[in-house]
Amino acid sequence: TNENEEMNVGIQFIDGIYIQTKMLLYYSQIHLNQQEYDDNREFAKTITINLLDFNYFASKECEKTIRIKTNQGDIQLEEIEMKAIELPKFRCYDRENMTEREQWLQYLKGCDEKTLKKIKQQNEFIRALDEKAEDYWIKEKME
């Protein structure tokens, strides 16, 4: 963040059943995992990123920020923040000049080999993640 604020971030892929319940349960799990530190530190703000490989919301935008409000609308619980990203709605119109955000979304959505190679050349974090995933699948054994 701009203020060097400590944050607790969780990322999950969600299938098409019980979407809202899964988002809330995952948020609470990630947030409460901070208790395991048991060193009296303050809870960091938790943000969960929920990746959907299908369309769920009616709007055209691929990314939603979800916060919980009271039924009166006068209090917003700013600490509770969940992101939902509908990957099928993501469109990258200029694959030659992708922003870092577009690179991540294109990587998570899936892309052709040429685009993937370009993304990995430009983004060291995606390259490292892709190498770890490749190593994992090489070592994974089916039983």
Task: Show which residues each predicted segment covers.
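Elongated, amphipathic alpha-helical interaction scaffolds
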Residues: 1-143
